[in-house]
Amino acid sequence: MFILSKIADLVRIPPDQFHRDTISAITHQLNNKFANKIIPNVGLCITIYDLLTVEEGQLKPGDGSSYINVTFRAVVFKPFLGEIVTGWISKCTAEGIKVSLLGIFDDIFIPQNMLFEGCYYTPEESAWIWPMDEETKLYFDVNEKIRFRIEREVFVDVKPKSPKERELEERAQLENEIEGKNEETPQNEKPPAYALLGSCQTDGMGLVSWWE
């Protein structure tokens, strides 16, 4: 689930960090830049593990900061394909089940076609149901512990909203308030920069309580 990933980067050390020793200053800046952020095509960076190489610092004209080329290793959350993972159901929709690894990662989705054969969604209870036989129905309920298999990882280049897009959204929201409308302004929900797709289709998968 966690790997060590080797990364090279140019680190900027601002003057207010000069009181630190070089290694501490570099590690501090790297954690600010990478920790708890998605590294494209790598995974979710948890923390900086160690520094492998540190070159001499360079100064740029008109800038009091020091620039240092470094190679380091980072602890990265990146489950391998086929890995069996345990999480908690955070949401059920007609499209499938959203799973959270509490405090670590929330963008995990099990699509409806990756659930056990015969599973169906009940809007009244906001839950998925697996009918094992005519008399036994097993529920996928929110906040239940679920075991699943990693089938695919998805990286998306998510770009920040432009000033024009933000201006249009704010204007639409203001118009709604003036007209006394309570509905929220429709917004295009952007996909997460890194997401995992899972499956529950084999023995032992599904709610952990079923198999205890």
Swiss-Prot record:
Example of a GO biological process term: termination of RNA polymerase III transcription
Subunit structure: Component of the RNA polymerase III (Pol III) complex consisting of 17 subunits. RPC25/RPC8 and RPC17/RPC9 form a Pol III subcomplex.
Function: DNA-dependent RNA polymerase catalyzes the transcription of DNA into RNA using the four ribonucleoside triphosphates as substrates. Specific peripheric component of RNA polymerase III which synthesizes small RNAs, such as 5S rRNA and tRNA. The RPC25/RPC8-RPC17/RPC9 subcomplex may bind Pol III transcripts emerging from the adjacent exit pore during elongation.
Family: Belongs to the eukaryotic RPB7/RPC8 RNA polymerase subunit family.
Keyword Nucleus attributed: yes
Compartment(s): Nucleus
Chain residue ranges for the region called Disordered: 166-194
Modified residues (Phosphoserine): S162
Transmembrane segments: none
Biased segments, Basic and acidic residues type: 166-184
Pfam families linked: RNA_pol_Rbc25 (PF08292), SHS2_Rpb7-N (PF03876)
Organism: Saccharomyces cerevisiae (strain ATCC 204508 / S288c)
Stored CDD domains: RNAP_III_Rpc25_N
Keywords annotated in UniProt: DNA-directed RNA polymerase, Nucleus, Phosphoprotein, Transcription
Miscellaneous field: Present with 752 molecules/cell in log phase SD medium.
Signal peptide positions on this chain: none
GO cellular component labels: nucleoplasm; nucleus; RNA polymerase III complex
Any GO molecular function: DNA-directed RNA polymerase activity
Taxonomic superkingdom: Eukaryota
Designated name of the protein: DNA-directed RNA polymerase III subunit RPC8
